[in-house]
Amino acid sequence: YFNELAPGYHIVAAGSYMGLALRRENESFPVGKIDQLTMRPMGFVEFVRAVDGNPLADAILAADMDLLANVSEKLERLLKEYLVVGGMPEVVSAFAASHDFIEARRLQQQIIEAYESDFGKHAPARIVERMRLVWKSLPGQLAKENKKFVYGALRPGARARDFEESLQWLMDYGIVHKVPRVSALRAPLTSYEDLSGFKLFCIDTGILGALSGLSPAIVLNGPAVFTEFKGSLTEQYVAQELLLQGKTPAYWSSSSGNAETDFAIDHAGTVLPLEVKAAENLKAKSLRIACEKFKLERCVRTSLAAYRDEGTLVNIPLWEIGQIDKLA
């Protein structure tokens, strides 16, 4: 109607279930008439702006590494807070006003309950229980040393074909994101996707923490959060930041199993492999193997260590990984 009879009006609409709505039979969609934007949870810099103000957030966006090096302890503290609170707007708003981690967890649990109650409202009844199994398995899947999604962990004898539809519904629902394995670190990465392997990440670090029952105290007190659960919360955070920057992350592992990159992204006409390290651990054996094997000129390690450009290898602090395009 508006396009044909009232083209002078510009309409903005928001919805939570666009991916599900388009799955319905006989559902029409005005191709070429709509610009779509994907809203994701708030990233780390948006969280900093909400709870600490504009100056520090602006410095993060500007990738002012000299200035940021002087406040690295504060940034690490804020990063831990973000891992607990996450980026769901209601939770961030409440936390910015109260700095109450218990209240943040309560709101996250409400969001989880709303997600789970909606499974039965939109998805076919025959797959609802399988959707719940996949959803509830996320903390355990990401806590493994090898974070490749394993269908057999869902229930004894589970096979991919039994759960593929339920997994696709969760992806369309927008609360999980699949990061595929690639057989080679060559551009474009989509040409080398290996359909047999993938990692599955949650929509948000805070939601993942609440889903796993992780105590905020474990995250906030000391460096344990970066090593607990095999660094799953840290890797979840990096996945979120990459997605927020419009990246389509993948990961690579060698056929022999002796090397793996946590992520890889298409970058400036080539591929940029990325390794997520716990705390200030700077060993990057797998990353070096990957760079040598595929003759890559640049690779990224992200950790709590300071920014360091060593030519082929650049270390980007975890709290600055959202600015990877400026620093890599």
Where are the language model's segments positioned?
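Hydrophobic/aromatic beta-strand patches that form the interior of the parallel beta-sheet core
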Residues: 12, 35-37, 201, 250, ...
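Interdomain motor-coupling "hinge/lid" segment immediately C-terminal to the ATP-binding subdomain
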Residues: 8, 16, 21-143
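Catalytic cores of nucleic-acid endonucleases
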Residues: 278-319
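Short glycine-/polar-rich loops that comprise or flank the Walker A/P-loop
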Residues: 7-9, 31-35, 247, 295-298
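Active-site beta-strand-loop-beta-strand hairpin of nuclease catalytic cores
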Residues: 265-273
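Conserved Walker B catalytic segment
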Residues: 1-12
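Short beta->alpha connector loops
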Residues: 17-20, 182, 255-257, 278-282
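Accessory nucleic acid-recognition modules appended to NTPase machines
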Residues: 88, 92-266
